């Protein structure tokens, strides 16, 4: 009986460590600011979320995504809706077909040449959506 109790405690401790490693955000994540003066619009990714969920950019601009943590991301056109991934090619949006981030890197999407509202999502992390508003 003592061996069973010890095994149970060890398994629960391991589960707690794994859950803590997968969730939350670290203190080393990027700024929530959408742009810096004089630079391209930027959205940071931290853990399993975009630091900000929407950004407004000007027609003709590109968007830089920055992965501030070691989490891998695969970004595509579309969004998560009620826990289900909805791949969607939107007219006027640059095609984003499984753009891979392997942690601590950045990539640029665009240019966004048409005005409108476009959606991007991480195919790996449910609920990780970004709305890009182009004016």
Q: What would you call each of these model-derived segments?
A:
Residues 11-16:
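Core hydrophobic alpha-helical transmembrane segments of single-pass membrane proteins
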Residues 1-9:
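Bacterial N-terminal signal peptides that target proteins for export
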Residues 5, 17-18, 22-135:
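Extracytoplasmic copper-binding redox domains, predominantly the cupredoxin/blue-copper superfamily
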